[in-house]
Structure formats: C-alpha cells, structure tokens
Amino acid sequence: MALYRDEAVVLRTAKLGEADRIITLLTRDHGKVRAVAKGVRRTKSRFGARLEPFMRVDLLLGEGRTFDSVRQAESISAYAGGITGDYATYTAASAMCETAADLLPAEHEPAAAQYRLLIAALGALSRHLHDPQAIALSYILRAMSLAGWTIRLDSCVVCGSQDVEFFSASAGGAMCPNDHTPDAVRVPVHVFDQLRALEQGDWPQLDMLQTPDPRCENIVREWAQYYLERPIRSLRLLD
C-alpha cells in the first residue's frame, strides 16, 4: 500500500464499526480525501482529538481501494479550540466545512485554492476577527466562485444594466426591473451592497455592520442550494 503525506482540515467524521471513524478531509495537495482512522473512538487512541472537525493536521495516509487510512496525525492548528465554545462560531464553521465537503464531490483532485480559502476562514473564526455569520457567508460565496459558480451582483444577468433590484439564483444573480424573471425576489440596494462586500471579502466595510442583513443569508442559502442541489443544513442554524 502506497503511503503519502499531506496536510488537511477535518471536515466531518462518521462512525465505522465499534471503534473506527471515516474522516472526510480537505487536503492541501490531494483535494478531498476520505480515510479510515482505526481505533480513534477508543479512550486511549493514539490520535487523541487531532481528528475532530475543524482541526488542521499533518497526516501520513495509506492509499486504499474504497477509503484511504490514517497512519499518523500531528496537529498544525487547533482551530476547534477557538470555535467549539461559542454557538455562533461553531455553526458558522460547520456550515463552511459542510460546504467544502459538498463542493468537491470527486476525491483526490487537487484543490489548493479551496484549501487556502478554508484555512483562512477557519483561522479568522477561531480568532474571532469578524462576525461569524459574515465569515461563513463570505466563505460560501467565495468557495462557490472558485468552483465555477460566481454570483453576479453588480449588473443585470440579462442586459447588463446596473439598475438592479431583483435576484434570481436560477438566472445567475442580479436582475433589473425590465428583465427580472417570475421567480426573482426584490432586493434592497443595501443588501446588494452587503452581498458584494461578502463576495469580495471587504472586511473594513463588513466590520461596520453588527451582522449582515438576514436577506443576505437567505440569498446565499438559495444560491448554494440551487447549484449544489442540496441544502447546507448547518447554515439554517445561523438564523
């Protein structure tokens, strides 16, 4: 069995048998990887808490037919320590990791930009640099853009007019009064401004808000669900 070393963020875990877990990882060099950690649920497991969600770890993995296997794990950044103690921060991190896992359906396909974006967002969450909801919404929009689903917010997706008053996920983003589709929803100017700031990661502007307008979350949720073809369940907990 070939061995390889990589660093990774733990996205989610699932029980396997009596003592093992399947660990879903976003790695720096190999994209999404699912690996079995044997004995990790035992009290005296050699892995300790290093394979819990939100942890950034250096791993030695063995290639397998269905799942790879975790041979060694060393902590790089214990993001979980600054995340799990606060409900809003925890749910934001959960929404981000769920998005990362669902955005990358294929395994062992390099996704270095996605990895860098996720560790930056988790680092900001763990240090409480910005509003947790804003970090999560910004991450989701930017991760989806990296995956090829860039939301259009500055002009109408039909005619290019900058007089945008509506939004439609199925149409691709902002729409003007003349060309909006029946499913489009009316969006105030300040909500479009906040969405642009979230998509661009404009933290000086976002930090002036206590938290983004609730309609920003509704639009991000609709956008993600339409293109991922499934809801981000953790995102609903941010309400």
Curated annotation (Swiss-Prot):
Cited SUPFAM superfamilies: ArfGap/RecO-like zinc finger, Nucleic acid-binding proteins
Gene3D superfamilies in the record: Nucleic acid-binding proteins (2.40.50.140), Recombination protein O, C-terminal domain (1.20.1440.120)
Presence of the UniProt keyword DNA repair in the record: yes
Position of the signal peptide: none
A GO BP annotation: DNA recombination
Keywords, alphabetical: DNA damage, DNA recombination, DNA repair
GO cellular component: bacterial nucleoid
Organism superkingdom: Bacteria
PANTHER family on file: DNA REPAIR PROTEIN RECO
Annotated family: Belongs to the RecO family.
Role: Involved in DNA repair and RecF pathway recombination.
Protein name: DNA repair protein RecO
Source organism: Bifidobacterium animalis subsp. lactis (strain AD011)
Taxonomic placement: Bacteria, Bacillati, Actinomycetota, Actinomycetes, Bifidobacteriales
